[in-house]
């Protein structure tokens, strides 16, 4: 008898099996994109000096915790490329898809991504220490460093500031600078409704109080997880120095009283 090799034919996949494979592949691709975004965010922290190599694993695990994830697979390459806004968008979208981020609106996305950025932030005491060490060298070096930190931390959102509209116009009183600030997000209807239903809180007492440092925020109060203040002493009283997150003008800074008292402008 003549010998033949019998090669079994591949059975055709059912529609459901085919769809399951597609879904599985998409899930793997989606997970890989999230891992790349996490790696990209850690890389961003390293590149900006927010963290050091010794902090990288800790920062990654903190990000995983905020994302509601309990595992991580190291992706190939340097991580997700692009600016900070693009990296955060991937993480925010995934958090909403998995139900970790309940509402997909600018108010709630801002509350959430501020938690992510805090994973890269030094403690307030470390910021204060580094500021005054630089101040001994040069006050300008100290304030330049602090301003950069305020931007790198995404407390000042560079990608929104550049959208602000600015121009000058001549008036009978002189040249007038006009700014339309687009970096301060408007509340969406859901956030407004949630703020009305929420229990009224008197903490922090205002958006400038010292107690804002590290505050997670809520629908009617911005997140300040990534906010750091430099304590200063003026006339034997405690004050705070910070930059404005909305930058109404170049290096817009604020000095405020350490106590919550009515503002009085006099001589």
Locations of the language-model features?
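Short, positively charged and aromatic/hydrophobic N-terminal segments
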Residues: 3-24
